[in-house]
Amino acid sequence: MPVNLEYLGFKLPGNVDEKYVQFKLKYRKQYHETEDEIRFNIFKSNILKAQLYQVFVRGSAIYGVTPYSDLTTDEFARTHLTASWVVPSSRSNTPTSLGKEVNNIPKNFDWREKGAVTEVKNQGMCGSCWAFSTTGNVESQWFRKTGKLLSLSEQQLVDCDGLDDGCNGGLPSNAYESIIKMGGLMLEDNYPYDAKNEKCHLKTDGVAVYINSSVNLTQDETELAAWLYHNSTISVGMNALLLQFYQHGISHPWWIFCSKYLLDHAVLLVGYGVSEKNEPFWIVKNSWGVEWGENGYFRMYRGDGSCGINTVATSAMIY
């Protein structure tokens, strides 16, 4: 039975009606009268839920109204997350030690500043985060090899990756294997995103990039940061429960709010840093558009496996 948060002392703001109107205008939401009443009730419930997160989480993150404040937890999970991930049983190709390289990295680093990261994209109402995390990684790896930043097709993976399930979820580790079998990825412009499962329209003569293999990376976040610095961006899985209401700051939830064993979202590590308050963090690219979070990005505490962000880290390899 859901907990009534108002009984716990959380209160709706007096201008909640006005906030709802502003929310609909800002995010261009339109509902019929009956649907509007349902969404307003969900909106109010989510405001209280965001207050709960704000009080009982660590870190400097601010939680509140976002583009997804009109969705229930189940609706949000079904349309923006993916099925629960299974941690790979074999990590035989995991680099166990980077030696001196671990201590030879800067305090702050961001692949965006190197021109290695494409613009933030939007998966829409489709559980294809795994495809965006994968293409983001391949885009950066291709840039590192050739110096060319190309925007690659997520829709190709949604439609043609036989190891995954399109808008119903998937895994970057499977996607890498499928990319190799398909011979590579087409450009976004030549196979544009449509946010739904469709028939495969892959044209092998239209493939723009290739990969040779993939690698499962260490769960040690110090070594992950070193790998990112010396190599490229990293595809990771995480528990994204709190991200529904994330606005900005460094997210650092207690494990009870964000179990590392319940991974349901794929994102892309593009950098790392340390805040003025000495909080180590990851810079993470999401696939929910630029109106969410910090212009489509968020920062997650680095060092204690918050939300399982270090649990399943992978990358394509291009020789």
From Swiss-Prot:
Subcellular location: Lysosome
GO CC terms: lysosome
Enzyme Commission number(s) of this protein: 3.4.22.15
Pfam families: Inhibitor_I29, Peptidase_C1
Glycan-bearing residues: N212, N216, N231
UniProt xrefs under SUPFAM superfamilies: Cysteine proteinases
GO molecular function, one term: cysteine-type endopeptidase activity
Function: May be crucial for metabolism of host hemoglobin.
PANTHER family, sorted: CYSTEINE PROTEASE FAMILY C1-RELATED
Name of the protein in its database record: Cathepsin L
Source organism of this protein record: Schistosoma mansoni
Gene: CL1
